[in-house]
Amino acid sequence: MPNPLRLAYLVFEARKPARWERFMKDMLGLPAPAVHADGSTGWRVDGASQRLVVTPGPRDYLAAVGLECADEHELRQLVQRLQAAGHRAEQGDAALCSQRKVQHLWHVNDPEQGRVELCVGLAEAATPFASAAFPDGFETGALGLGHVVLVAQDLAAMEAFYGGLLGFGVTERLQTQVGPVHIRGTFMHCNQRHHSLALFDLPSSFRIHHFMLQARSLRDVGRAFERAESLGLPIDLDLGQHPEPDGTFSFYAETPSGFAFEIGAQTQAI
């Protein structure tokens, strides 16, 4: 397995980006974003220059998953492995790198045509991160940006791509029945975070099921839940604790695009 990757950023296309701006400010309490030439906005959740990017467009969907490599050598190795396996990996130009706030970037599609951006050198912001909504901040750093859960129609092919080619390890697997629907899932890690990526075979019109931000304190999670209720956001799952070995105490609610977000704390490292 290569040196640890980390989830660097997520890019969302939104039909109504103004709703996302209110969500980022009112729900997540994030500082004012950077505004790019194409109209996209880059939002901070820590010392990095941006972690969540919202770009205006005709669809509500996950436009890209950004994965940061340890260094340029690891990036080149991953690109070579992908190309040898028949995947078309293309280098991002200077304009895209500037937009993503990284030094170098290659992009490739996973087996279900989801865009993955492999990068190095995510820029740090000039000022410390501060949020009145999350005064204790979020757990990021070497663990990267929380996690993202993707909907996978072909779970085996997606596991082979993210595991066999990108080097994610399987933390645990899940099989459950929700009414008439049989759900299978695979939780995958690329560093000490329990999972930075999960793949779920379930009915959905979205590529993404949810993304998660890990708060540093339970107090901030509780206040976030109260804030979600006061803002009238649909609550998908009430406050509760995941079973071991994850152990996260969290809740799930809906983003302005209709897929979910999770705010949690006390996730166990592996």
What is the predicted function of each stretch?
Residues P2-Q50, L150-H194:
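Core segments of cupin and vicinal oxygen chelate
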Residues R15-P17, A70-E74, R216-D220, S257:
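Helix N-cap motif at beta-to-alpha junctions
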Residues W20-K25, L82, Q113, M158, ...:
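Conserved active-site tyrosine of GNAT-family acetyltransferases
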Residues A34-A37, T41, V45-A70, D93-A95:
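Conserved donor-binding loop and adjoining core beta-sheet/short helix segment
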